[in-house]
């Protein structure tokens, strides 16, 4: 993931996924390995879109992960556009609907949206796709380095 998305000292990753899920591994270790900052959300904050906006703004989060159903809930917040620090929004765990991808790109114009896929048994993520405005679908993508 570092080769593909290049975190650096100016980045902040929000660790918000419960530790029982595979994504929490990269949320926790990736920023530490790359010299970026790690912001840790309080338990349950990932379920409250308004609070999540506050946390993203408070810590100037640049990178975070959502399963698409949680991204849909987050997009329900009228305050999403205030998350101007976001540079990377990563989705995995469920199919990412094209409509949701387009809504996210429109409301967070400073952020890239990535769809990742990978069976937990083999690795956390093995393929990736960069979503683009106007895409009619969201494939699982190509192998990630």
PLM features per residue range, with description:
Residues 1-145:
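Motif- and composition-driven signal specific to adenylation
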């Amino acid at each position: 993931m570092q080769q593909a998305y290049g975190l650096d000292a100016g980045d902040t990753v929000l660790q918000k996924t419960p530790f029982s899920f595979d994504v929490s591994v990269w949320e926790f270790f990736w920023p530490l390995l790359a010299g970026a900052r790690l912001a840790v959300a309080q338990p349950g904050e990932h379920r409250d879109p308004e609070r999540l906006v506050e946390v993203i703004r408070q810590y100037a989060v640049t990178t975070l992960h959502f399963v698409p159903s949680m991204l849909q809930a987050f997009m329900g917040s009228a305050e999403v556009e205030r998350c101007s620090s976001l540079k990377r929004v990563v989705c995995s765990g469920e199919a990412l609907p094209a409509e949701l991808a387009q809504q996210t790109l429109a409301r967070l114009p400073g952020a890239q949206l990535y769809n990742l896929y990978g069976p937990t048994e083999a690795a956390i993520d093995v393929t990736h796709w960069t979503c683009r405005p106007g895409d009619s679908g969201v494939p699982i993508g190509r192998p990630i380095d």
